[in-house]
């Protein structure tokens, strides 16, 4: 019983980690795209706030 439970927990943890990794890489991609488009005029908050008209 304990080994089955441990295997189940391991699978759940791996699934969560895989999902988080995908989310993070997607988020990093969107941040770098935004930053390039706006020449880096973005706040470092989540979600990033950007000012395309050049305000700080």
UniProtKB/Swiss-Prot annotation:
GO BP: any one term: negative regulation of endopeptidase activity
UniProt keyword annotations, A-Z: Disulfide bond, Protease inhibitor, Serine protease inhibitor, Signal
Site, Reactive bond: residue positions: 44-45
UniProt signal peptide: 1-25
Propeptide: 26-39, 54-56
Domain of life: Eukaryota
Annotated crosslink Cyclopeptide (Gly-Asp) location: 40-53
Post-translational modification (record): This is a cyclic peptide.
Free-text function comment from the UniProt entry: Inhibits trypsin, cathepsin G, elastase, chymotrypsin and thrombin. Does not inhibit factor Xa.
Protein name (Swiss-Prot/TrEMBL): Trypsin inhibitor 1
Source organism: Helianthus annuus
């Amino acid at each position: 019983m304990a080994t089955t439970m441990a295997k189940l927990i391991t699978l759940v943890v791996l699934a969560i980690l895989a999902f988080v990794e995908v989310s993070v890489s997607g988020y990093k991609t969107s941040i770098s795209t935004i930053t390039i488009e706006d020449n880096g005029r973005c706040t470092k908050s989540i979600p990033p706030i950007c000012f395309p008209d050049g305000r700080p």
